[in-house]
């Protein structure tokens, strides 16, 4: 509790309430806020505004380039292709084994 008392003194810098919100200091009279029409009649002249520079038009919403990486099924451009292209190999495509041990890519250090 000593730490809380010190924090209260350092931060609030006032007397600590005994207990609960009812013990907090009451405002003796309510604040009297003037209506907007009752405020001071002195007005300041407005400052001239600078001309607005034309901005580039807002472009259409761009597709998220990472969408196809993290959510492959939600890529709008490849959604209709499905597994015909990506999940099944082409009939004439070489396997990894074929590629690694073919004559062109085979290591020259092995027989």
Swiss-Prot record:
Superkingdom assignment: Eukaryota
UniProt KW Isomerase keyword: no
Pfam assignment, any one: Auxin_repressed
Induction entry: Repressed by exogenous auxin.
Polar residues composition-biased segments: 74-95
Any Gene Ontology biological process: auxin-activated signaling pathway
Biased composition (Low complexity): 43-57
InterPro entries in alphabetical order: DRM/ARP (IPR008406)
Key words, A-Z: Auxin signaling pathway
Family per similarity comment: Belongs to the DRM1/ARP family.
Name of the protein in its database record: Auxin-repressed 12.5 kDa protein
UniProt source species: Fragaria ananassa
